[in-house]
Amino acid sequence: MKNEKRKTGIEPKVFFPPLIIVGILCWLTVRDLDAANVVINAVFSYVTNVWGWAFEWYMVVMLFGWFWLVFGPYAKKRLGNEPPEFSTASWIFMMFASCTSAAVLFWGSIEIYYYISTPPFGLEPNSTGAKELGLAYSLFLWGPLPWATYSFLSVAFAYFFFVRKMEVIRPSSTLVPLVGEKHAKGLFGTIVDNFYLVALIFAMGTSLGLATPLVTECMQWLFGIPHTLQLDAIIITCWIILNAICVACGLQKGVRIASDVRSYLSFLMLGWVFIVSGASFIMNYFTDSVGMLLMYLPRMLFYTDPIAKGGFPQGWTVFYWAWWVIYAIQMSIFLARISRGRTVRELCFGMVMGLTASTWILWTVLGSNTLLLIDKNIINIPNLIEQYGVARAIIETWAALPLSTATMWGFFILCFIATVTLVNACSYTLAMSTCREVRDGEEPPLLVRIGWSILVGIIGIVLLALGGLKPIQTAIIAGGCPLFFVNIMVTLSFIKDAKQNWKD
């Protein structure tokens, strides 16, 4: 019993350093919000302007890697000896469910406004050209390219899971073929894991920072409760308590049911917006946007704007590529886990087609609705953002639909469930990554999960206190830098090991 307790306890070398680092950064930020904003702006400017090109080349190189997997020597290799664990339909549905987070609802509803009001390529703000390119840029940033990079890492983790039979809970476990067991399990591996965990903590905190205002703004619209930072903090605290109760009472089945409800409700809400907003316009706009995407794709891939220095690629392309980089390991581990028994080609094609369809549907329906509301002067988004913030503007794009009360109730429930499952996933992932050993069928310790959910909640509150999107963008970009190198090392380790051990 003593030995079992030791194995399932925390791993100090990857538990305390991220806890201390993140705690100190939060304390310094709260101590002087104005000074923190100055530092945030400086970090954002440095990383995006000096290293933005690296993120763009990373995505392009990983895209070539995807083609190598699909048409190369490993295309027909099977990831495990068992038949696929899930049917193809269930598999794609699970991938769709992973896309319908509250943060996705946040960006899907408002992103197009920023592209139209501050467009790329020197276009005039709010011009016809800017509107024609608006959705096309969303399709680029949330389309096949990033999902192709995820599929490469998913193949890598699935290979380590099901072919090499490795128990991977931290990225250092995959680096043995690249740097050797001594370094992978020593100081180097510990540093890699700590980079991963610190970045992941901030990424999850930013997702919570995006999701919470949507729920509190819904509460203001539905119940007349004023939206304040204190209300945001109360809501986050309630989610943490609810998560703790679910874990303590063994209600994980309930959380899984909530995830299914979230997916079905997402389909229902998107279908409603599609029908009442203007199905014909949405399909025409999508078709035109695909053409614009194909026409501008080379420029989008390598757009850094070094001459005009308008800031668009730094604020959006580099930000989103960092977003994809920072979530790559966590998402790839999940996608690998549900892909047992599939071939490399199946996984790569299934991910790119299934997940691209999911994100394109979300962005097309929500973005088109927002554009229609802007064109018809039904809502004044710049005024709403200036007076009340971005979350209120998003809420008004939903409230402007027919049967507004029923629509808002649906959106409120969707955001609430999405954030409950987000907090649960955050605490589970971080607890798994900071424990010595958690075997199949076991849960990480309750107190560890609660502790991480509290810390993620604190980060969300701190980012909300700073105000605006820049702190959230900076947290993602700064966290994406170390993960950029970690992802490359995992990729190289897979390639090296597969060449030696994955032969006919």
Swiss-Prot record:
Keyword annotations of the record: Antiport, Cell inner membrane, Cell membrane, Membrane, Transmembrane, Transmembrane helix, Transport
Membrane topology: Multi-pass membrane protein
Subcellular location: Cell inner membrane
Pathway participation: Amine and polyamine metabolism; carnitine metabolism
Transmembrane segments: 10-30, 51-71, 92-112, 143-163, 195-215, 231-251, 263-283, 316-336, 347-367, 398-418, 446-466, 475-495
Broad class of the protein's primary localization: membrane
Family annotation (InterPro entries): BCCT_CS, BCCT_transptr, BCCT_transptr_CaiT
Pfam families according to UniProt: BCCT (PF02028)
Keyword Membrane among record annotations: yes
Reaction equations catalysed: 4-(trimethylamino)butanoate(in) + (R)-carnitine(out) = 4-(trimethylamino)butanoate(out) + (R)-carnitine(in)
Quaternary structure, from the entry: Homotrimer.
Protein name, per record: L-carnitine/gamma-butyrobetaine antiporter
